[in-house]
């Protein structure tokens, strides 16, 4: 009642049905015909995404290296594309102006054809996306030391403190300089600075802040 379909006939029918579809969708991005290089190519990511982007006309080096690249690739199948480009660049520099001149003429002809075909063409290079800068500041390490100088009696006295808790204590010390005797205050501050350095190795920042707020500076009479 149902005819038996031969597997060879089925395979041939599938191939005939797929060949036209493949021929309509496939294309070569680069051919030996110079005019084919002006075809529109699909754009990548960015503003040209989903639209057709026109290629730039070839310059003299591109015209010369079009055949040379293929020749070098056939002679050295294991050579990478980056190495081939370096070799072609070196060979191009070694050519004389007379040897380069035919390729400059061909490049000018291709540029004239490009202007006629795309009169409104403007070269818009794709810019790399810049990394976004974070507004968050990295926390300072507990071992980082900040230095500051205080003017007492026309002399600068350096003070070293750790973390924000010690900074607040030194700020209170600086405020007291305006209403106290300069020499006595300087001696007291130097004594407390020596005390802070000896206790900073074993005390945590929280304990050090509590200790500084509980011990006001000593003013000898």
Curated annotation (Swiss-Prot):
Entry's localization field:
Nucleus speckle; Cytoplasm; Nucleus
Q: Which residue intervals make up region (Disordered)?
A: 24-53
Which GO molecular function annotation, any one, does this entry have? RNA polymerase II cis-regulatory region sequence-specific DNA binding
GO CC aspect terms: cytoplasm; nuclear speck; nucleus
Give the Gene3D superfamilies listed for this entry.
High mobility group box domain (1.10.30.10)
Main location class: nucleus
**Per its UniProt record, what SMART domains does this chain match?**
HMG (SM00398)
The reply to whether Ligase figures as a keyword in the UniProt entry is: no
How is this protein organized at the quaternary level?
Interacts with CALM, EP300, HDAC3, KPNB1, ZNF208 isoform KRAB-O, PARP1, SLC9A3R2 and WT1. The interaction with EP300 modulates its DNA-binding activity. The interaction with KPNB1 is sensitive to dissociation by Ran in the GTP-bound form. Interaction with PARP1 impaired its DNA-binding activity.
Per the entry, what this protein does is: Transcriptional regulator that controls a genetic switch in male development. It is necessary and sufficient for initiating male sex determination by directing the development of supporting cell precursors (pre-Sertoli cells) as Sertoli rather than granulosa cells. Involved in different aspects of gene regulation including promoter activation or repression. Binds to the DNA consensus sequence 5'-[AT]AACAA[AT]-3'. SRY HMG box recognizes DNA by partial intercalation in the minor groove and promotes DNA bending. Also involved in pre-mRNA splicing.
- What's this protein's family per the entry? Belongs to the SRY family.
Q: What is this protein called?
A: Sex-determining region Y protein
Q: Supply the gene name.
A: SRY
């Amino acid at each position: 009642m149902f005819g038996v379909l031969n597997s060879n006939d089925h395979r041939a029918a599938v191939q005939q049905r797929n060949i036209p579809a493949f021929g309509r969708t496939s294309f070569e991005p680069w051919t030996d015909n110079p005019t084919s290089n002006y075809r529109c190519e699909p754009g990548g990511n960015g503003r040209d995404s989903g639209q057709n982007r026109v290629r730039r006309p070839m310059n003299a080096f591109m015209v010369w290296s079009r055949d040379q690249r293929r020749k070098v690739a056939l002679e050295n199948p294991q050579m990478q594309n980056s190495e081939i480009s370096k070799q072609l660049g070196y060979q191009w520099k070694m050519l004389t102006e007379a040897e380069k001149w035919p390729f400059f003429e061909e490049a000018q002809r291709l540029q004239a054809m490009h202007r006629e075909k795309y009169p409104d063409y403007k070269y818009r290079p794709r810019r790399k996306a810049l990394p976004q800068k974070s507004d968050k500041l990295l926390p300072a390490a507990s071992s980082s030391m900040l230095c500051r100088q205080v003017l007492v009696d026309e002399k600068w006295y350096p003070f070293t403190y750790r973390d924000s808790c010690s900074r607040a204590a030194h700020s209170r010390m600086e405020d007291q300089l305006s209403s106290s005797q300069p020499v006595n205050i300087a001696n007291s501050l130097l004594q407390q600075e020596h005390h802070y350095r000896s206790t900073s190795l074993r005390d945590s920042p929280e304990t050090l802040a509590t200790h500084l707020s509980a011990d006001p500076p000593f003013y000898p009479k």
